[in-house]
Design a protein with these regions (language model features):
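Membrane-embedded transmembrane-helix bundle of lipid-linked glycan/lipid transferases
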Residues: 1-386, 390-395, 453-458, 467-477, ...
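Active-site-proximal, structured, solvent-exposed surfaces of multi-pass membrane proteins
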Residues: 2-8, 530-531, 710-814
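Extracytoplasmic
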Residues: 114, 176, 368-676, 682-697, ...
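Active-site proximal loops enriched in glycine and acidic residues that flank catalytic Cys/His/Asp
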Residues: 191, 201-203, 237, 319, ...
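A glycine-rich phosphate-binding loop feature that marks nucleotide/adenosyl-phosphate handling sites
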Residues: 248-252, 410-417, 721
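Hydrophobic, well-ordered secondary-structure elements that form the walls
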Residues: 343, 356, 406, 472, ...
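Short amphipathic C-terminal alpha-helix that caps PH/PH-like domains
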Residues: 347, 695-710
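Short, solvent-exposed coil/turn segments at beta-strand boundaries
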Residues: 467-468, 654, 674-679, 727-730, ...
Length: 814
């Protein structure tokens, strides 16, 4: 047997070991009946099923699904590649979603482990490369991502990261120009999988190359490598550009509170016992990797140390001390440090493979340390986050009661299962879903959850009607936490036509008798405009929040349709024009109430003044002073604990003092009017905020009087039967009753920027309003032209860089 044949035989043995191990893992999951596990997994499995069913119909990229969040663009904000992979596995399994999930472990295990074997073959370190290939899937954070978090796109990126690192190493260290193509393709595929992780991969590569430059001076190739990676991301522009407009990416980008939850002290991230005691979702990085990295820094040759140094630096960045610095950096939203773990592991493995002078006996010790550290990760049952049979049964019962759509008001306490159990297995429409940040009705969902938290059930049931939900589920545990009983909310449910029809083990189900499919025609009594408008509607459901915070975005005619206008945290572009609009609205008979605590500062004099009334800062401790209102003394409750040190504002400049309070020897005004503005009220002291926060009855009585609308009042809602037909490329809506075409019918379908129609469309509270008896709507790919331009530009830039790279390389050789 020749040396060449021997090498091929060894290579085949290494790859066969990987395939057998992957098959063993998948076989274990299949034979044990391993349930899909992880906090997010059922939401991702639902999207996988949607992709599979769309592909069966010949629709390669479904633009719209009606089942979650009153309608959502499922694959606009979540990269589609992982769902294509799952759909492919479902084709192999004859549509068996659970079997496809179990086979996915084989795919990720083998595909993710293969680069390390190829690396070992390249460096003639087959045993170590094979060991790393087998271990990659079982690294602590990878197991957590797969079985505890259940984040399918992240699971797929863990198998792409090794390829990106391998091609980066081949291009920079081995001067292999062909590797640039692999690097480019890897970044494109990662972009189509999880955009934020792709950005983190780019940041990791930059930091690694920066560290490596200390020992290996090759600025040119490193810059070119980063350019190729950027070109790969740009080439995915056809999907990336639409995904950046709103939705999940934007929400994640600004969420520093989430970033702070992904920070752990070293006593947690390096303590193998704490993970076992603290729970399966605790972040454990791996003590063995850190010990080996320290040894590598001390003993390896300088040119091989970058991966070890990178590990220690990035691990330090996961600590609370580093968070205080990271949060102040530009693009700090990228520094979700635990998401760097696959990249840290990858560069660490690469450093170990580069450490060619490490003797075999020490390689065995290295492998033993990593094995011992990861052995607990092989107990898959420990990481399992399973769904209870009780939850599955209750979702089945709920769907049987539902005609059009259901709302499960559970604050995600059921986990992600309802997103599949309601919409996936029974194809019932669902007001909620999973990962609300990608939903057009995201604000509506937040308000429903706020209403539950603050016990505003009157608002909750009313808005459930608006969202088209004929059934509403409320968990018993939420009522118990609030120390209220079902009888306490019966009146609020009945006010919107709901009655309790089924008591389940853990929840109550409310039902309203409705047409099979219905929309609503609604008459709101009041309009709230400004930053805090949504919050006030919790207490005053007869008000609707305006679509803009800017006064000039409304016409006098539009505002005059309402009985009362409440302004809180509003804005204007031109103060004089805004004041003129409100003056005309008041003259037309609409009551205008201005929350003077939140008046914009005048651009010229920086004073908080509007319509000649000024807001003057004041400070209270514990509670408001005694308030004088209509010859009565009002004593309010104490402030909430977090508001005990309360800064607010009283008002000056009014002609008529309606509400006052005494501060020392001064009588100050909190409610007043001007003689030349007989229908305009100026309100101070942030009374609305306190009334909403604490349901202070004394303050609510004042506000009811000032607004001219009771907090018990609901909007006038008329249910209108409609017929909706969904197609792959659009939908049609028929209104089966007479209605005022100017007002239109709220269809309860989430309004989308991909809807186009020859008939008039509008939106109210993020929901689609139609104005004709028959409406045909087509779906158009969002931002197609700018997306395709970026894609073509990225590919052209890549080709140009390749040509420049090859040309410069040839010049160097000559």
């Amino acid at each position: 047997m020749t040396d060449s044949h021997k090498r091929i035989r060894k290579n085949c043995i290494c790859i066969s070991i990987l395939l057998l191990a992957g098959a063993g893992l998948a076989l274990y999951l299949v034979l044990s009946g391993y349930e899909p596990s992880g906090g997010d997994i059922w939401g991702h499995l639902y999207k996988s099923q949607e992709m599979y069913e769309s592909l069966k119909k010949g629709n390669v990229f479904p633009l719209f699904s009606p089942y979650w969040y009153n309608g959502i663009q499922l694959f606009r904000y979540w990269g589609p590649l992982s769902y294509y992979i799952m759909a492919g596995l479902m084709f192999l399994t004859g549509g068996d979603l659970l079997l496809a999930y179990r086979l996915l472990a084989f795919v990720i295990f083998v595909v993710g482990g293969l680069p390390w074997i190829l690396w070992g073959i390249h460096e003639n370190r087959r045993v170590l490369g094979t060991f790393f290939g087998l271990l990659w899937f079982f690294m602590p954070e990878h197991i957590r991502i797969y079985f505890t978090a259940g984040n399918l796109p992240q699971m797929v990126t863990t198998m792409l990261v090794p390829y990106a690192i391998w091609f980066l190493w081949l291009y920079v260290r081995k001067k292999n120009n062909c590797a640039a193509v692999g690097l480019f393709v890897c970044m494109t595929l990662m972009s189509f999988t999880h955009l934020m992780v792709t950005a983190i991969m780019g940041v990791s590569a930059f930091l690694y190359l920066l560290i490596d430059q200390i020992w290996n001076k090759d600025t040119r190739r490193k810059i070119f490598a980063l350019i190729y990676m950027i070109c790969g991301i740009l080439t995915a522009g056809i999907w990336v550009i639409p995904s950046l407009k709103g939705g999940l990416v934007t929400s994640e980008s600004g969420d520093g509170s989430v970033m702070s939850t992904l920070i752990y002290p070293l006593t947690t991230s390096l303590n193998p016992f704490k993970r076992l005691s603290a729970g399966n979702d605790s972040f454990y990085f791996g003590l063995a990797a850190v010990l080996i990295a320290i040894a590598g820094i001390l003993l390896a040759r300088g040119g091989k140390k970058a991966g070890f140094v990178f590990l220690l630096i990035m691990l330090a960045c996961t600590t609370p001390a580093a968070y205080r610095i990271l949060v102040k950096l530009p693009f700090s939203q990228l520094f979700w440090m635990t998401r760097f773990a696959p990249m840290i592991y990858g560069f660490f493995f690469s450093a170990c493979l580069e450490w060619v002078r490490l003797k075999k006996k020490y390689c065995v010790l290295l492998a033993a340390l990593l094995c011992v550290d990861s052995i607990s990760c092989m107990n898959l049952d420990f990481y399992s986050v399973a769904t209870s049979d009780e939850t599955k049964m209750e979702m089945q019962q709920l769907t049987k009661l539902t005609d059009q759509r259901t709302a499960v008001i559970d604050k995600s306490s059921y986990g992600s299962y309802p997103s599949y159990g309601i919409s996936g297995s029974s194809h019932t429409m669902y007001t909620y879903g999973w990962a609300w940040q990608g939903a057009a009705t995201g604000d509506n969902i937040v308000l429903l959850n706020e209403a539950l938290d603050r016990k505003y059930y009157r608002f909750l049931f009313d808005r459930a009607v608006e969202l088209g939900a004929d059934t509403v589920l409320i968990r018993k545990s939420d009522l118990e936490k609030q120390d209220i009983t079902i009888s306490d909310i019966e009146q609020d449910a009945a006010a919107s036509g709901y009655s309790m029809v089924q008591e389940m083990t853990t929840a109550y189900t409310y039902k309203r008798e409705t047409p099979e499919n219905f929309g609503t025609v609604t008459g709101y009594y009041g309009l709230a405009i400004g930053k805090y408008a949504n919050e006030m509607t919790l207490l005053y459901p007869a008000f609707v929040a305006g679509s803009s915070d800017v006064i000039e975005d409304y016409s006098v005619e539009e505002l005059s349709r309402y009985d009362t206008l409440f302004l809180t945290g509003f804005e204007y572009r031109n103060q004089s024009k805004a004041e003129a609009i409100l003056t005309d609205v008041a003259a037309a008979g609409t009551r205008v109430v201005i929350d003077s605590t939140h008046v914009p500062a005048n651009k010229s004099n920086k004073q908080e003044m509007f319509l000649g009334v000024f807001a003057q800062q004041i400070h209270f401790d514990e509670r408001y002073p005694v308030l004088s209102y209509q010859n009565s003394e009002i004593r309010s409750d104490d402030f909430a604990e977090e508001d005990r040190d309360f800064s607010t504002a009283y008002i000056t400049g009014t002609d008529t003092e309606i509400g006052t309070f005494q501060m020392g020897n001064q009588k100050l005004t909190f409610l007043g009017m001007k003689d030349d503005l007989p229908n305009v009220y100026f309100l101070g002291l942030n009374l609305m905020y306190e009334a909403v926060s604490r349901k202070d009855a004394a303050l609510v009585d004042i506000l009811n009087d000032v607004l001219g609308i009771s907090n018990e009042q609901l909007p006038d809602r008329e249910l209108v039967p409609i017929t909706i037909a969904y197609k792959e490329d659009g939908l049609s809506i028929d209104v089966d009753a007479d209605f005022d075409q100017e007002t239109g019918v709220n269809t309860s379908i989430a309004a989308q920027d991909i809807f186009t129609s020859d008939q008039e469309l509008s939106e109210q509270m993020n929901l689609l309003v139609v104005h004709e008896r028959h409406t045909e709507i087509s779906f158009v790919y969002p931002m197609f032209v700018p997306g395709i331009i970026i894609t073509i530009s990225g590919f052209i830039c890549f080709i140009l860089c390749i040509c420049m790279d090859v040309r410069d390389r040839r010049k160097h050789i000559v």
